[in-house]
Amino acid sequence: HRGHEVISDTRTITVELKGRTPPTFIAVEGSIGVGKTTLAKKLAASFNYTTLLEDAEANPFLERFYRSREQVALATQLFFLFQRAQKIQDMRQTDIFEPTRVADFLMEKDPLFARINLDRDEYQLYDKVYQQLTINAPKPDLVVYLQASTDVLLSRIENRGLAIERSIDRGYLERLNEVYSEFFLYYDGAPLLIVNANEIDLANSTADYQDLVNYLLDIRSGRHYFNPTFFR
């Protein structure tokens, strides 16, 4: 990231730093299908950072969860909790060697999914486990929240065609959007960039990606909003 101006992901994109230093630890968040991992990988390539990525397909309960949430909700949730906690622990152990990272999750969001997926007794058990883990997650220097409508999420999920996600329904995505919006309405744990992702194509549009990176490089504190329609 010191002097890097060219990235290579699926294509070469020029990013002009203009003397600006990227945030050291960036976390990208948002609902299912919004493009978290795509953006995290692109930012990591731009700044020559290491990625810290969720591995949803490693969760053996997830496909059954999307078909019938009640039966395996707790197992699905605990698997993700342990996976995220392990990734954070591994990150802390290697931080001295690789201090610059981009993650496609924020540890504090884990209870959001638990709140909408678990019944009361299950949530109490989940919360005990969560508290016992005492996860000392490092604070990001910037959180990027990708926000998109349910229609856009459904379209992107369909377009990427993952078999594991075929059973995701509109109602579930609407509820997820609600809890994400509420969470980030009050979030003050790190500088926050809220991105209107409805009309932005970070996967395929070089211009959209460059506009976003140019905007986030100037952020040092506070809450910011990126609406790509303002740049056109």
Predicted features and spans:
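Extreme N-terminal, non-catalytic leader segments
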Residues: H1-T24
